[in-house]
Amino acid sequence: MGDQRVHKPRTAKTRTLRVNRILLPMLLLFSGETTSVVTQLFSVDSSGLGISLMQSVAIALNASSLALANNTAWPLQHEPPEDRLEIESYDYIVVGAGSAGSIVASRLSELCQVKVLLLEEGQLPPLESEIFGLTGALHHDERYMFLEEAVPNPKCCQAMASMHGCVWWHGRMMGGGGAINGNIFIPGSRENFRRWNSTGWDWTQVHKTYSRLQQRLNPSYLQPNKLNLKLANLIYSGSAELGVPRMKQPLIAGATFGYTHHVPVTVNQRRRASSARLYLANDQVNRRGNLKVIRGAQVQRVLLNAAGSRATGVIYTLNGVEHTAKTLGEVILSAGTLNSAKLLLLSGIGPREELQRWNITTHQDLPVGRNLQDHGMMPLFLLFGSNCAVNSTRDPTENPYAPVSITQYLLDNQKGPLASGFYMMGYINSSSPSSSRGEPDLHVVAHTLLPKGSTGSFGYLGFRPELIQAQQDILQKGDLLQIMGSLLRPLSHGKVSLSSKNSADQAKIENHYGEAVEDQQTLLRYVRYIQKLSKTRPFRRCGLRLWKPPLHECDTLAADSDDYWLCYIRYFYVGAWHSVGTCRMAPRKGVDSQENGGVVDERLRVHGVKGLRVVDASIMPELPAGNTNGPAMMIGEKGAQMILDDREANNEVIQEC
């Protein structure tokens, strides 16, 4: 008989195999040479079946990853004429493809007879923007974010790195902030819109717009993992001991009290979905020849006629070359709360004294940039003193970055830890947490478990190096529960003005977080509420106790005194990136001495300028009681409908594509 010795395949070293198991799913995301990748990673002989099976999985992974990263659904990039003297003309020019602007451009281009130009400074959103478990990687990436700072203010944001002011992040890509924020879709409440006090914007009218919007968005709920469900139950049981209930009805910010982890978000096939993804990235829109999209376009200013009474177009730069686009219809600014205000100022629309400072001709004296508002947020930390049901058991398969999670996401229809998420929200009357009367004034949100040994959250927030180190040191001892408190109706407002006449420079931002005495008192009540929560039986079972970061200025004050916590507020009450209000909707001559009237009317038309509207969160007279992304999309939908209605009012025959 011949040699019947068993063939012993070559085996990779254990360490190499472990690394290869980690690298395999990631390499296959970008590799088309599946056979060679598999054989190189697993240096073994095979009769064929093993390699064939691995190759089949690799091909499936590769196909799934390519489909996930597919950008062909987006409208093609339009190239303006090379000859700068050849000026294109459009019926509508929309500036900004964010949460509102994407909807406006899509809705207007439904009319076949109109030409629409959409100008967006950013580019296509990256893969990470559509995966809940990966979006955090983009939050310091200037390719996709405007990382702007306010003027340093000794009365707020003192925890920021030396000589830095509060950070104001906003999106810089198709989808804008909606492509990078929490995708939370909360409408606001009836009372919110009553206080706006604008014709056509009461709850009855706004609710109709939300109903139309929700048919397209189809908001749904994230699936939390087991660990987050345990955390939710800890919050539910602890807050119940204080008389704060678990919400039984759907979440309506500002109208319901209590806690819930059933927070609606905008998703599409288990992927994060901005309004740009839902309204622009589809074949139906791509077939429209009347919609032109230019990415990477930085708008310099709006062109006005000699009298400053009509918008006639915009000037923008693309790849360093200046272009002009004209319109016989309208320019719609949807560039966001900071940039829409900046563009109006650069165009000669704003406070006269501000424009004179920069030698800009004043076409319309309006309070542009005033009334800047943000919910703000302040973190408090509870250190786990012992293992409990919340943090004692962690399933390694629930790590979103584990190879098994990546493989599951790609092969199992975008399921698994990468697709999961967790939002826990509480709406509370800080004066009487157990009361359900009146309106909540405190939003307790983002109950985040910072695991032992992790890098923590201070680096992400841009805090001082010594604070980052202190948090990392305490995380060597145990897990931290981070809780954010946010004011639903802050009285401290800021403003936006120009830092130069160059449109490429960020606006000058002045904020005053927590300076109003009423805001300070609400934040103090928030601290006392969390202290009471930490003393409930469920929290005591986990050994949870308050951890206070070292603050030399504050630590010299009496421990746990109001003075100490007011000092803490000056350091840690920072931006929540919910900016609104700089192009306030109100009559031109308002009686409100602080804001001195409005910038746009109830149909979002800039006072005194025909053919110019602002359609984004900057028009909000005051903050909604919750996240601003949903209301911003509502404004986009309602603003687009107003423009379409105005065409019908002119007896034009509407022809839809």
From Swiss-Prot:
Enzyme Commission number(s): 1.1.3.16
Active-site residues per Swiss-Prot or TrEMBL entry: 578 (proton acceptor)
Cofactor(s) for this UniProt protein: FAD
Induction notes from the record: Induced by RH-0345, which is an ecdysone agonist used as insecticide.
Reactions mediated catalytically: ecdysone + O2 = 3-dehydroecdysone + H2O2
Coiled coil as UniProt keyword: no
Residues annotated to bind FAD: 299, 577-578
Gene Ontology terms: biological process: ecdysone metabolic process
The entry's keywords: FAD, Flavoprotein, Oxidoreductase
GO molecular function: ecdysone oxidase activity; flavin adenine dinucleotide binding; oxidoreductase activity
Pfam family, one: GMC_oxred_N
Chaperone recorded as keyword: no
Free-text function comment from the UniProt entry: Involved in the inactivation of ecdysteroid molting hormones by converting ecdysteroids into 3-dehydroecdysteroids.
Protein family membership: Belongs to the GMC oxidoreductase family.
Full protein name: Ecdysone oxidase
Source species of the chain: Drosophila melanogaster
Gene: Eo
